[in-house]
Amino acid sequence: ATFADVDETKTAEVRFLRALNYYHLMDLYGNVPFTEQVSAKAAPQYTRKQMYDFLEKELLEIEPKLSAATPKKSTDAGYGRVDKAAAWMLLSRLYLNAQVYTGTPQWQKAAEYAKKVMDSNYKLYTGATKNGWTAYQQLFMGDNGENGASVEAVFPILQDGKKTASWGSTLFLMASTFDAGVTVNPNGVAGNNTSENWAGNRARKSLIDKFFPNNNAPYVHANQMTAAAGDDRALFDALQADGNKRNIDQANADQTGVFSNGFAVAKFTNFHSDGTAGHDAKFSDTDLFLMRVAEAYLTYAEATARLN
C-alpha cells in the first residue's frame, strides 16, 4: 500500500502544499516547469492555462479528503495543518484571477468559495482589547496562537523564538520595519520586543494618505496614531528615537536609503498581549497567518462587485 492509502488526510495536506507552491509560481511567473514526480529529466513547461487547470482539478479532488474546517489554538492538535477552508481559500484566489490566467472570468465561483470560508467556523477576530492592544493588533503579536486571534487563521505558519528561530518569516516582517525609536506598545516601550531593528521597509506617503486624506497626519508614535486616524490599522510611527520627526515623504529618489524618510510601519510585533515575555530575546514567537478569513471577505466583495 502507498502512503496515500494509509493516510488519505495527510496526503491531501501535502498535495495542498504542492498546489500552493505551484499557484505562487503560476501567479508570479506565468509559464513554469511542471512535474508531479522526482525525475532526472527536465520538467515540461506548462502555460498558465495548463497550470490553472491542474490546480483547479487538484484542489477540488483533495478538498473532501481534508479535515473539517476547524479553527484552532496553538495548544490544539493539528494547529498549523491545513483543512478544507484552506482549499476553499486557494480556490477563491484562483477563481478571482481566472480571467488573467485563462481569459475566462469566474467571479461566481470566486464568490462561492470565499463564502464557504465566511460561513465556516473560522471567523473574523473581534476580541476585546487586551492591555491596550486592539483585536487587530492581536492578529500580529507574539501570542497570536494563544490570544484568540487564531479563530481567523485559516493557515498559520508556526513560529516560536526557541524552536523555529529564523531570520525570515515574521522576524523579517517586524525587524525590517522597525528602528529603535518605533513605539507601538501602549505602555510606551520602544521596539518590537526582539533585539532586531533593521530600519528598512517603511510606508510611502500614498499609504498614509489613505488614513489621513487631508494631509493632516500628526507627528506621534504608533501607539497614538491609531486614535488620531480613528482606525486600528493606522499603525504608523512618525517620530524618531531622539524626538525628531520622520519625513512623511521621500522627496528625492536618492533619499530612499534613509529610514527616517517615510513613516515606519509597526504592524507586526513580538509583544504578547497578556504581558508575558517572549520565548527568546532575538527571534519571533509571532505566527504568520498566511491565509486569514479577512481575505475571504475581500474576495467575496470584489467578486460580487464585478458580477453585478
For the regions a language model picked out, list residue spans one by one:
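Aromatic-residue-lined binding/catalytic grooves and analogous aromatic/hydrophobic interfacial grooves
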Residues: 26-35, 52-76, 80-202, 308
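Elongated scaffold/linker segments in the mid-to-C-terminal portions of large proteins
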Residues: 125-297, 304-306
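Short, histidine-centered active-site or binding-site loop motifs used for metal coordination
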Residues: 38-40
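Conserved, well-structured interaction surfaces
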Residues: 1-29, 42-53, 59-74, 263, ...
